[in-house]
């Protein structure tokens, strides 16, 4: 019975993915998300941990500013427009997303914003040979939720119009996360070949979220108001991640010209493409 259910579910998801790829917008989104995660993860095989931080900080500042701007100017307003009679409910979902991300980061150890902790980098024998399943699960939940708001339908207004802008934001955000995850797994497992299964699971989380939202539960999401709640939840998630990134890239609170330039570039790009 269980095997039959698994086979039916697998065939259904496979059919959904086929429809997904036949749609150019969806095909592009899944290709970009897979490429950025797997590409950034592969880079960890050649870039030393110490040198990785040199290019991660400007990229983090850029992606943090981009995500923050996109959330404030488009995702939050659209969530409020979808629930005009109950705007406070959106606020509650934003709070749930913000503080829910705080709890997820206890498990993920901040991998979402490019963290590879000092003790993990310099004590590779601690936890060696073991996959950090809780960390990976937290990352998958985080990534799945981000993918689930990428709905391309006229009924979702600005979110659909800015589909590509949000896809780019998620992809930019996933690059440092994938690099940090691959680095941590390499230190834990001792072989980069053993990194790929975990990296692939992370890479697939957002595409699966997109497929389910667009081809499995779209009508239920739109008719019940749950899509507005989902937007609020992910908006809170994005606000937590983006503000954490922006503050952490300059913990000494001094003027840092490269960080400032990257932040302004992220702000400008989000305003230009959205």
For each predicted feature, which ranges?
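Intrinsically disordered, metal-sensing/regulatory segments
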Residues: 1-274
């Amino acid at each position: 019975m269980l095997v039959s259910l698994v086979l039916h579910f697998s065939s259904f998801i496979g059919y959904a993915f086929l429809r997904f790829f036949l749609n150019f917008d969806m095909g592009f989104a899944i290709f970009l998300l897979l490429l950025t995660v797997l590409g950034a993860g592969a880079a960890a095989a050649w870039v030393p941990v110490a040198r990785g931080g040199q290019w991660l900080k400007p990229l983090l500042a850029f992606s943090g500013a981009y995500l923050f701007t996109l959330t404030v100017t488009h995702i939050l307003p659209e969530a409020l427009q979808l629930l005009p009679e109950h705007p406070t409910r959106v606020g509650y979902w934003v709070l749930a997303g913000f503080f829910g991300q705080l709890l997820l980061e206890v498990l993920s150890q901040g991998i979402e914003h490019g963290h590879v902790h000092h003790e993990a980098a310099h004590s590779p024998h601690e936890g060696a040979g073991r996959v950090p399943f809780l960390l990976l699960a937290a990352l998958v939940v985080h990534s799945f939720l981000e993918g689930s708001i990428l709905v391309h339908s006229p009924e979702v207004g600005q979110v659909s119009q800015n589909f590509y802008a949000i896809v780019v934001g998620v992809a930019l955000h996933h690059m440092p996360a994938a690099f940090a995850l691959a680095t941590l797994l390499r230190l834990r497992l001792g072989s980069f070949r053993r990194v790929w299964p975990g990296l692939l699971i992370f890479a697939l989380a957002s595409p699966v979220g997109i497929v389910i939202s667009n081809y499995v539960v779209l009508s239920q999401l739109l008719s019940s108001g749950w899509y507005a709640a989902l937007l609020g939840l992910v908006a809170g998630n994005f606000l937590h991640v983006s503000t954490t990134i922006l503050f952490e890239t300059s913990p000494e609170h001094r003027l840092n010209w490269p960080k400032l330039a990257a932040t302004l570039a992220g702000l400008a790009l989000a305003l230009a493409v959205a």
